[in-house]
């Protein structure tokens, strides 16, 4: 049995989020108020938070149930789960709380934000969390390997995506797939990418994207085809039709 002691083990999390918010304010934050649509979207995301985190955990291969995920998020106790899997769920909760913070939702969906999300997602796993990887990685199910990420190039390509003449949902999908394929960090790239693209959507009051648990295998198959450059259209259609939820 693994007892969840989030208040004790992660008592500094709120202070860490405040520090991150302060850093983001120094980078790009402008004092403003949330629109009614964005406030509604934040409430929508909060109402679906347990379900969203459960689905992200399944995508990550975490051995959890909806009930166990809910218990962990609420600070309860669970049976037959590893401490690593529990921590992944707790970190997802903290990452979502971070992007749903008013100051953060008003910040740009940029490279700095992407790094901060990964730092939270990978807290307690890698000391390099939130930093660009400098080691090669392999992807299960394919011989394709991503190039080493270059910060200046990533910033440039993210800006290029944001400047395209696309609607907000299509832009969010492009951000999600780009950051997944680049494998920018040593670990947690899918979790980071989903939350990052949702920051963009929510900041515009356009809903959320999450991969349904029952469609995880289909999504992974399409993702491999996308990585290999064999089919880019199908996964975008799949996400828009089966993973996107409007408010």
Please name every model-derived segment.
Residues 1-247:
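FIC/Doc superfamily catalytic core
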């Amino acid at each position: 049995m693994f007892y969840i002691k989030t208040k004790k083990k992660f008592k500094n999390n709120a202070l860490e989020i405040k520090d991150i918010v302060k850093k983001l304010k120094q980078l790009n934050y402008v004092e403003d108020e949330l629109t009614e649509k964005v406030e509604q979207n934040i409430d929508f995301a909060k109402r679906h938070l347990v379900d969203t985190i459960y689905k992200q955990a399944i995508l990550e291969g975490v051995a959890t149930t909806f009930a166990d995920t809910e218990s962990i998020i609420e600070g309860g106790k669970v049976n037959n789960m590893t401490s690593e899997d529990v921590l992944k769920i707790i970190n997802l909760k903290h990452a979502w709380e971070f992007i749903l913070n008013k100051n953060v939702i008003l910040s740009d969906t940029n490279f700095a934000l992407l790094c901060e999300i990964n730092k939270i997602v990978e807290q307690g796993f890698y000391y390099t969390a939130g930093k660009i990887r400098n080691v090669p990685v392999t992807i299960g199910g394919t011989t394709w390997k991503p190039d080493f990420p270059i910060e200046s190039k990533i910033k440039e390509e993210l800006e290029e995506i944001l400047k395209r003449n696309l609607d907000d949902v299509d832009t969010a999908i492009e951000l999600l797939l780009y950051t997944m394929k680049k494998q920018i960090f040593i670990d947690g790239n899918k979790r980071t990418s989903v939350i990052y693209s949702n920051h963009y959507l929510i900041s515009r009051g356009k809903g959320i994207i999450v991969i349904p648990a029952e469609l995880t295998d289909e999504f992974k198959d399409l993702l491999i085809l996308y990585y290999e450059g064999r089919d880019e259209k199908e996964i975008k259609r799949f996400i828009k039709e089966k993973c996107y939820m409007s408010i």
